[in-house]
């Protein structure tokens, strides 16, 4: 189907008129309520009675006033912009012959917007526009809308009228502001440049109806030269090129630029507009930058003011018709603002209304609908329904724990709530090299890549460790007074790990209950047990046989009761008879511990042996992540004292057998297996019989280098652990500030390998301290958690 050379309904422009309409700066407009400021050459007193706006034609030396004279024929048009592609210009237009000058001008190059002058397509006589203005102003050409005052227009609303029936011109269909003659005698050429914006007959376009299903692309077109703001100042005078459409059912996108501007607007890039559009019947809001025409979508602004959606349809002025190339009938709908789609209220007269013009693109799913679908899929799902879980499980099967220290740039953690006990624990874990390397080994997935997850704890700590990067090369230490070395530290920007805080709610931990004491040791157990359980569930994907042992696995499991020990037969697969020193035998029971990378870092075992008269010893192995040290006794002043008290033999009072006979029973705890990272918990919070809780503020001395005595180990492993396997070095201390057990504050000191020194981190505050300040007693703070690493792994 051949398309003829289009004509603009404005006709031909002389150079002066072109500069007047497209180049000269526009006047400012005072929108209602009218402030009395003179916006043009007409004085305020010249306004008609009841008229709220001053009719101003930008760049023209006179004000066009409304007249109640002639009624406009339906073929006339009113436009609020000089944009020749505006959809308001859908009307008949006479076709004028090209003159040799016009043809020569088409071949020249326009210096206004650096595009070929043929793209401007200004082919009519130079006096057509002036005659139109004169006829309109003299004959009351503002038309039936203005005469009946059914619709109020803001300043700058133009009246360019053209009688489509003059001089026997054939009807023309306007395609994006270009009048294309459909007559057989009209002159034109078949140019693919003008075929890009053709509309199909199955979807006729109307100017004022935003209710049809439409597509919206919110991102501006890359490298597109047209303005990003959708103001009335964006005058377009070109068309996309290099796109031929043979089937109107398929979208046709330009290969070069979608729109070209005739005038470079100074504020084109300002992020000041708020655009509303409709996609598939949904209201979409794009804040900031204007929406570009892309994927077959164009946006046009209509600066109409005071549109009343509550008026009956019959009283609304008819919309201008669009004659499609295939002869589709015109559709007339009342003008509506975007605000009317939300509620029946008048839109602000100062806000431009953005309309969307579709180009037959396939329907794009609504982003709002996609978000709802995303919300349905988000959250916790079983491991079997998580497609990423199997990948993480395979990685964890092959992971090798790395204990090499890493120099990380310290970053504070913003505390907007009562999260100091969490922040202090997180800083200690970040300073733990094997923990850092483990989480960095697991890939970081975004919400888009993994909307639903079966491992929220792992995901959050992988994200946390990725917040920290290698520290830049520190400056050389500078000498200060007294030959004291002063080191500088440049911490990174503080951040708020909200995704870590949300874990308390996601996993429904008892720590999230209101009124509970916020305890750093309890939170550490929550983290390590949570990571361990998630890794166990991943192991089940590869080895389902682990499932039957998962209940009794991990430090969270309790010691088997003595009655249960008696009921267990000697042939149980979980027990065996062990021969100790001096040929003493004992029955040892142990759960089938499934190892995970977390137990490989923090997991140790303690042996609890029960001694009973005239009976074999009964031993139970129990895993731990933190070693609980009772410091309540007055004899305990150091960590070594607390460790010796841990392994001391104690009597169990009131123990009876099945025959109701009271027997003497004692119990002793020893260390069966020492972990690479040993966390000591100084139990400062003791519960009274009355139900209250008090804090032990006594000072407990702790060394930087800690050696675990052989006497603390179980008999079977005493000779298997060399001194290097029993020696630890301090790398983090979590302090509790205050004398109350129901409140206070938590801070952390961590060893920084890059500085070869210590840092004190109080939420988002980071400062350098010396080692003496770490171990020195203080009245306002007491050590609560001690983090040690084995020296043979340093």
UniProtKB/Swiss-Prot annotation:
Spans annotated as G3BP1-binding: 6-21
Positions annotated as active site in the UniProt record: 420 (nucleophile), 745 (proton acceptor)
Chain intervals for the UniProt region annotation (Interaction with p53/TP53): 2-99
Region (Disordered): 123-164, 303-326, 546-588
Phosphothreonine modification, residue list: 24, 99, 568
EC number assigned by the record: 3.4.19.12
GO biological process: autophagy; cellular response to interleukin-1; DNA damage response; DNA damage response, signal transduction by p53 class mediator; DNA repair; monoubiquitinated protein deubiquitination; negative regulation of canonical NF-kappaB signal transduction; negative regulation of stress granule assembly
CDD domains, A to Z: Peptidase_C19 (cd02257)
Free-text activity regulation comment from the record: Specifically inhibited by spautin-1 (specific and potent autophagy inhibitor-1), a derivative of MBCQ that binds to USP10 and inhibits deubiquitinase activity. Regulated by PIK3C3/VPS34-containing complexes.
Compositional bias of kind Acidic residues: 561-577
Residues of the USP domain: 411-791
Bias (Polar residues): 313-326
Entry similarity comment: Belongs to the peptidase C19 family. USP10 subfamily.
Descriptive protein name: Ubiquitin carboxyl-terminal hydrolase 10
Organism: Rattus norvegicus
